[in-house]
C-alpha cells in the first residue's frame, strides 16, 4: 500500500522514485503580511542522502486558497547568495537548478523569496466609513514538500500587535505560537515526511485599517531629446483599492469633518512620488483635467510630490491619474566607445503594491541606431514602431514592452539602455529649417518686391 501511495505521489508531482534523495534538515518560513500583498522568505537546509551528485531540487511554493504566485527568486547562501533561475513546472511547482551539483552527504542552504497575491481578504467584507478593518490569512503549519523535513519554523509578521484571533497548538507539551508583539512563531521538531497529508492549519485575523492599493494599469512613456538634453516622462496609473467596501453610501460631510481629527480610514487620500532632484515642469491630471490639490517639495537629493485625488478612494473604487515632468538627460547618461548609455528607473510610481499590467514606451531621438534595451522584468509582449514628430525626416524608433503582475521592489529596478547616435539627423533638421526660412523669405520678396 505504501509503495502504491509513493507511486501515486510520484505521478502527481512529476517526481520519480529515484529522485527521492533530498532531506530538509531545517526549514524556516517567514510570512510578511505588512505589505499590500504577501511576501514570503523560505530558508531551507537541504541534504543529499543519495548515492550520486544531484543538480535539481523540487520546491512547492505554498499558497492559501485563492492565492497565486506572482514572483519567485532563489539564492544559495554558500555561494555568496548567488542567484539561480527556478524552472516552473506547473502552477506552484518549481525545479531549482544546483550548480555545481551537490555531492552525497553535502548540504546547501536555499533562500527562496516569493510574492503572493489573493491570500489576504477583509472580514467582514464591508464596513462603515469610519470603522476598523480586519483582515484574515490562512496558511499551513508545516512545509509542503515531497521530501522529509526534520525541524521547521513558521513565522508570521503582522502589521500591528492588534491580533484578534489566531490558531493555537500544543506540540510536545509546548504551547504554540510564541507571540512577541506583532510576530507569531510556530516551531516544531516533529519529523514530517513527504507522504504526510495533514500539514495543519494556521488562521489569523488582525486589525489593519489602512487602504490596500493595487495598480490595475501602469503606462510609462519616456521621450529622449538629444538636442534639448532632456527626458520627458509621463506616467499614467489606474489605482484600485482592495480594502473592505463601504457598507452604506459615502458621507462627504462626515469625511470632511473627520479630517480635523485624522481618523483611521481604508480610503486612499494621497499618493506620494519621489522624483529626481532636478525635475521640472511637473503637472498632474486625471480624467477631468488638471488638478491643483498637490504639493511639491524640493530637497537636495530628490523632489517629493504629494498628489491628492479629487475624492477619497474607498474599497472597491478606482482612480486614474497622470503625472508628467521633465528631467536632465545627463543625470542618467554616460558615453563610451561612441555609444550612449542610459540607466533609467523602471518606474517612479509608488511601490509596495502589485501592478496587474504595465507598459513601457521608450521614444528614441531621431538618428539613434543599434538600440539595445535590458528590462529587469519578465516581458510578455514587445514591439518596435516608428513615429514622426514636427520636422522629423528619418523618424523616431519607439520600443514598447508589456509585463503582467509587476510587484513591489521592481519599480526601483533599473532599465539599461544603449544606442549609437548619428548627429547628422540633427544637422539635417537644421538644414531643413534653414531651407524653409530661405524659401519663405524668397517667396515674401517675390510677392512684395516692386
From Swiss-Prot:
InterPro entries: Ribophorin_I (IPR007676). Residues 19-424 are lumenal. It is found in: Endoplasmic reticulum membrane. The keyword Endoplasmic reticulum applies. Residues 445-450 are cytoplasmic. Belongs to the OST1 family. This is Dolichyl-diphosphooligosaccharide--protein glycosyltransferase subunit 1. It comes from Schizosaccharomyces pombe (strain 972 / ATCC 24843) (Fission yeast).
